[in-house]
Each structure stands twice: as C-alpha cells, then as structure tokens.
Design a protein with these regions (language model features):
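Charged, gly/pro-rich active-site loop segments
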Residues: 2-15, 91-145
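Short, conserved active-site entrance elements at the starts or edges of catalytic domains
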Residues: 2-34
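A generic secondary-structure signal marking the coil-to-beta-strand transition
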Residues: 20, 28, 55, 93, ...
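Short secondary-structure boundary/capping segments
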Residues: 21-22, 87, 124-126
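Short beta-strand segments
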Residues: 27-63, 84-87, 97
Length: 145
C-alpha cells in the first residue's frame, strides 16, 4: 500500500509524486462520473488505467452503455470532449483524475487499453465486439495518498 500523507492536495500532472503513481498502479475498482443531459451526475464502477506520461486515463466500455452515451452527447455539445472524473479510494487514501473524454473506436487504441488493463488488474478483459475506449485527456489531478 502507498504511504500516507496528511493533507489532500492538487497533484502536478507534469510531475505526479511516486506515492500517487503507485496508488494508481494498485488493483482497485474505480468510479467514472459522467453528466446526464440534465446535468445530474451518473456514477458507475469501472476499471481505470492512468498513463501519466501522456496525461491520459483510459476506461474500457460497451458501445451501448449509458456512460458512452453521456460522453458522446456532451462531447457533441461542448466541443473537444465531455467533462468527466475518475476516482478511487481505499480507507482515507483517495485519488481523482478530471478531464475531457472522447470515445475511441480504433482497434489499435482499444488493444493498447486492454493491455494496460491487464497490466493493472491482472487479467485480460473478455472479448467484446462492442467494446470502445473512453479516453480522458487529463486537466486536473487531486488526492491524498
């Protein structure tokens, strides 16, 4: 388990501290928050991978899921992407990544996301022809780890 600090804080996306990175490498269920068309939050459990070098978080999803529909609707309305957040916690430790999401359908991008998922969660996702990638370009990181 990652060492604990005493204060929550904004994390520098250009230079996240090792305890924060370690916390994102550990296996745990996360949440993804998207916004419904009426602006209310839709929060669902997901697996997330974090690529600090690219400043990207990735979530695999089914093409027909509500989270994908929310991202598509918001991205169309807002331009470059839908505002989303992914979060994970254990005890008093927590980490949140915020950013702009878009849906990726390219097989190579999905395969890379599956590889990263397997690396973090220890198993390859089962085959799914309806799989898409929610790719989040990160704008903010917060946490207490």
């Amino acid at each position: 388990m990652a060492p604990t600090t005493t204060a929550s804080r904004r994390i520098d996306l250009s230079d996240p501290p090792e305890p924060y990175l370690s916390f994102w490498r550990e296996r745990r269920v996360c949440t993804l928050t998207t916004l419904r068309p009426d602006g209310t939050p839709h929060v669902v459990p997901v697996g997330v991978t974090y690529d600090p070098e690219a400043k990207v978080a990735r979530v695999l999803a089914r093409r027909t899921s509500r989270k994908v529909a929310h991202v598509l609707a918001a991205a169309d309305a807002e331009g470059p992407g839908a505002r989303v957040a992914v979060c994970q916690f254990e005890g008093r430790n927590w980490a949140t990544l915020e950013g702009l999401a878009r849906i990726r359908t390219e097989p190579a991008e999905i395969a890379e996301a599956e590889r990263r998922y397997e690396e973090r969660y220890g198993r390859r996702p089962s085959p799914n022809p309806d799989r898409v990638l929610i790719e989040i370009s990160l704008t903010k990181a917060l946490g207490k780890v």
